[in-house]
Regions:
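Hydrophobic structural segments
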Residues: 1-192
Length: 192
């Protein structure tokens, strides 16, 4: 990835393996997070977000949802995201942790991946809760202190759901092309 680029390529690396198999791959990151119909719009759609706006320089989405208690929203995140991800070999598909600031969620902010540090951006947009993939201990403490609930639903689980949407768009645009979504790509962690 661009955050940690390859210094050299060997037979164990995906580009070599793809070439040997005569396959190609499309790899997208931040541009797909911010794109219309991209990672965070798909994530917002899973939670039936209305009146959506962008935040975090266009990457995240914030909008209205049907009022729900934080524990129920966390459980819904676990169930809905699991339905959009490849199931692990063992353990739960999605592990969710949350901080409940003590008020129901009417306005939700979502940002996939490692978005926990963006809690202040979510607060500035009037969100009651930030749902992201990863948040560290200090993000959780600060968010709760400032009145924002926080749900960390896993990096993989918040990003993988977009693959079906991208595949559908490619199939519609290029009907002669066989478009496959990996059934092997899974969260690298095994959860207890």
């Amino acid at each position: 990835g661009f955050l940690d680029p390859l210094k050299k390529i060997g037979p164990q690396d995906v580009p070599v393996q793809l070439g040997q198999a005569g396959s190609s791959a499309s790899c997208m990151h931040t541009n797909l997070d911010a794109a219309e119909g991209g990672v965070n719009e798909v994530l917002a759609g899973i939670f039936d977000m209305k009146n959506m706006e962008t935040f975090a320089e266009g990457c995240g989405r914030v909008g209205a949802i049907e009022e729900i208690a934080v524990p129920k929203l966390a459980r819904k995140a676990q169930q809905e995201l699991a339905a959009h991800c490849n199931q692990p070999k063992n353990g739960p598909a999605v592990q969710v942790k949350f901080v409940d600031a003590g008020k129901p969620v009417k306005r939700l902010a979502v940002i996939s991946g490692a978005g926990g540090s963006l809690f202040a951006d979510a607060i500035a947009m009037g969100a009651d809760c930030l749902l992201t993939g990863e948040a560290n201990h200090h993000h959780a403490i600060d968010a709760k202190r400032l009145g924002l609930s926080l749900i960390a639903a896993g990096h993989y689980a918040t990003e993988f759901p977009v693959t079906a949407a991208v595949a559908a768009k490619l199939r519609a645009a290029l009907p002669e092309l066989e478009v496959l979504v990996s059934t092997e790509n899974r969260d690298p962690y095994t959860y207890l």
